[in-house]
């Protein structure tokens, strides 16, 4: 498994948030972009893992198929602008679950929807501990195996001490 480039992941997250920033969509924010970058560090430690080892989660954002289906059926279907922003990236006949597995842009967009559905506010891009709290409560959930401390450690081991989220890298 190779390590993912944090700047390349940031570019995907920028594109995902930009693609959702349509009338009736989800406004793009630096907080959201960084939360998505942090999530890749928290979930896979920046490693190229697209399918959870011993589990169902998919993509670098490790989204479970049940979560993807729930997002589509109970949230996206009532927000046609956001649904259209995502589904326009799917190949004809491709399910959203397959899209999350096959296309990092789609995966990042769905991860953004997971965070948007949460009542929690996103935090400033340079607040790594705050991002960890949001990740644990809104994404990994209190019942999930991950801890805030482990998430910060995995993220920092991936990006290194000189990575600055506000300027997109070193």
Report the location of each language-model feature.
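Short helix-to-loop capping/linker segments positioned immediately adjacent to catalytic or ligand/cofactor-binding
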Residues: 22-28, 96-99, 120-123
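C-terminal/domain-terminus segments
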Residues: 122-145
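Alpha-helical scaffolds flanking conserved acidic
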Residues: 29-38, 126-134
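Active-site or metal-binding loop neighborhoods of secreted/extracellular toxin and effector enzymes
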Residues: 153-154
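Ser/Thr/Pro-rich, acidic low-complexity intrinsically disordered regulatory segments
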Residues: 1-25, 137-140, 144-146, 160-170
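Secretory-pathway/luminal and periplasmic proteins that interact with or process carbohydrate-rich
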Residues: 44-51, 140-149
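Short, structured coil/loop segments at alpha-helix boundaries
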Residues: 6, 29, 75, 79, ...
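Peptidoglycan-targeting cell-wall enzymes and recognition modules
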Residues: 2-11, 15, 38-120
């Amino acid at each position: 498994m190779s390590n993912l480039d944090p700047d390349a992941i940031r570019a995907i997250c920028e594109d995902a948030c930009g693609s959702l920033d349509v009338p009736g969509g989800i406004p793009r924010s630096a907080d959201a972009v960084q939360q998505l970058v942090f999530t890749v560090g928290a979930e896979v430690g920046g490693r190229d893992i697209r399918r959870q080892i011993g589990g169902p989660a998919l993509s670098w954002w490790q989204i479970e198929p049940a979560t993807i289906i729930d997002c589509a059926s109970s949230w996206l279907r009532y927000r046609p602008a956001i649904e259209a922003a995502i589904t326009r990236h799917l190949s004809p006949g491709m399910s959203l679950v397959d899209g999350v597995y096959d296309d990092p842009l789609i995966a990042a967009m769905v991860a953004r929807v997971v965070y948007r559905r949460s009542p929690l506010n996103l935090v400033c891009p340079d607040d790594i501990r705050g991002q960890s709290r949001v990740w644990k409560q809104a994404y990994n959930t209190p019942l999930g195996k991950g801890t805030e401390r482990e998430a910060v450690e995995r993220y920092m081991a991936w990006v290194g001490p000189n990575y600055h989220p506000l300027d997109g890298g070193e």
